[in-house]
Swiss-Prot record:
Keyword Chloroplast belongs to the record: yes
Keywords noted in UniProt: Chloroplast, Plastid
Statement: the UniProt record of this protein carries the keyword Chloroplast: yes
Full protein name: Putative uncharacterized protein ycf15
Length: 87
């Protein structure tokens, strides 16, 4: 899990958004404006007891303990989407 959180960039399809996993924060960015529209403390991510699946990859499931109302307020997608590594 620590390796996943310390990764750098992932591309989120079908939107032009990016999930940025950086030290201490998880942030979703719009690639066109580079505007961060949601951040989650890494400790909250690691301590989640009842996570809600938001994103999956072919290798990893990225899980957040964020309910639908909180996701809606943050403007986060409610469905599950595939993301892949970029370099």
């Amino acid at each position: 899990m620590e390796t996943l959180v310390s990764s750098i960039f992932w591309t989120l399809a079908p939107w032009k958004n990016m999930l940025l996993l950086k030290h201490g924060r998880i942030e979703i960015l719009d690639q066109n404006t580079m505007y961060g529209w949601y951040e989650l403390p890494k400790q909250e991510f690691l301590n989640s007891k009842q996570p809600v699946q938001i994103f999956t990859t072919k290798k990893y499931w990225i899980l957040f303990r964020i309910g639908p109302e909180r996701r809606r307020k943050a403007g986060m997608p409610i469905g599950v989407y595939y993301i892949e590594f970029t370099r």
